[in-house]
């Protein structure tokens, strides 16, 4: 990867990191204050995205280093390892989310009706992440970077997660008898994102 490609890749991931930090804080704060477990789960996923972005930045930096005695074939494998780390983090998130959702459904705990403010946040996150998916995917194709493609796929996963959170909040708010949909959405998110993580892990 030459200097120009490395710089463009780094800028792409740096922008992604900034957005994820903002969205993680917003989702978690609104999710907790507005009683939306689905949005909280989406916020936790954004925290995982932050770790993934940091790993991607490290991977891009190390992959750019020249060959040396310890790495006669260059450092490009660090980029691949960073991509694998992203997918591994997604899988860990899915396991935690599945456990939380299942335990909530089994215990039958009372869940408060989420407020509509959570729906607005989920909707905004959906639009933002889909825009970033399209941007990151084009950059990945242009630069021929597997790491950036993994990062782009994570943006798409985020967009779908936010969409499901949006649906869960709206349904639970207007139909209180279906308030448990928050936990069902948690299971759906865990399954879908788990499959995505496995796909990225296999490359």
Residue ranges and their predicted role:
Residues 1-203:
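Alpha-helical transmembrane cores and adjacent cytosolic helix/loop segments
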């Amino acid at each position: 990867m030459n200097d120009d490609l490395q710089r463009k890749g780094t800028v792409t991931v740096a922008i992604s990191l900034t957005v994820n930090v903002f969205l993680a804080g917003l989702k978690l704060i609104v999710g907790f204050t507005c009683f939306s477990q689905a949005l909280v789960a989406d916020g936790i996923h954004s925290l995982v995205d932050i770790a993934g972005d940091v790993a991607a930045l490290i991977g891009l930096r190390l992959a750019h280093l020249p060959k040396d005695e310890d790495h006669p074939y260059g450092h490009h494998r660090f980029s691949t390892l960073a991509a694998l780390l992203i997918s591994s983090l997604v899988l860990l998130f899915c396991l935690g989310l599945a456990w939380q959702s299942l335990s909530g459904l089994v215990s039958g705990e009372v869940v408060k009706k989420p407020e509509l403010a959570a729906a607005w946040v989920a909707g905004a996150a959906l639009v933002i992440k889909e825009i970033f998916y399209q941007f990151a995917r084009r950059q990945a194709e242009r630069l021929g970077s597997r790491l950036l493609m993994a990062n782009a796929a994570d943006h798409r996963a985020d967009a779908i997660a936010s969409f499901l959170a949006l649906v869960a909040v709206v349904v639970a708010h207007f139909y209180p008898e279906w308030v448990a949909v928050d936990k069902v959405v948690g299971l759906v998110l865990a399954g879908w994102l788990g499959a995505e993580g496995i796909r990225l892990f296999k490359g």
